[in-house]
Amino acid sequence: MKDKCKVIAIANQKGGVGKTTTTVNLGVALARMGKKVLVLDSDPQGSCTRCCKIEDPDTLEVTLSELMAYEMTGEDKDYILINNAIKQFENIHIIPSNISLSGTETALFNCMSRESVLKRTIEPLRNSYDVILIDCMPSLGMMTINALVAADSVIIPCEPSYLSVKGLDLLLHSIARVKRQINPNLQIDGVLMTMVDSRTNNAKDITRALRDAMGISINVFNIEIPRSVRATECPNVGESIFVHDPNGKVAEAYANLAKEVISLERKAQVRPRPHGLR
């Protein structure tokens, strides 16, 4: 019997903290461990779509926007439509996005049960995948709320800088509100420090302060994603870090992150997590 699919939102309202890089490379790493992975690009900028070497996304006939539009109008989404939306990148599948998703987000405000449109959209896909990763847009708008409602858990990429860490409070408040009002099973898998230059005291001090502030209530992954020129090249060449720099430290870090994500899921199946966010 197939294990339950886990939906993970990769979220932070601050841009440039490694959300898309984490989504793609964590997805590839999980697939390398035998998981069947689907990535959803829920950002109208289509950063994840472009990173996955999908050229001219604005010319695509079926994207996440069209699938959500069908859900909003109550029309049936047949498997032909869904299959036309799904693209292949290395060892993972992706449902791409383009600028039309901006219009979809606006339309959500006039939709019944607007916070759960994405959840209903991806429900038919859960039986086909082990993991669904949602690359969230850099805002706390309606699309990000939809991602949090659709998700089982959240991973929060965070750069070791004062402004990035300071902005976590607003995101954590939004997650707590979604958990309290709509999605009581939503959990935080952890805060992931990205683009870490371990040579600098500043990065070490900020990471240490974050761990102290979170205490035992919110996990801060021991794994950190190092700053790397090779990693920044990946979107330009349309490759994951496992293809572009397979023996580098970033590939090793994402491989270890994938192991920890699977370990968290196994622990959750053994014992219940504490109720609520503290």
Q: Can you describe what each PLM-predicted range is?
A:
Residues 1-278:
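P-loop NTP-binding core
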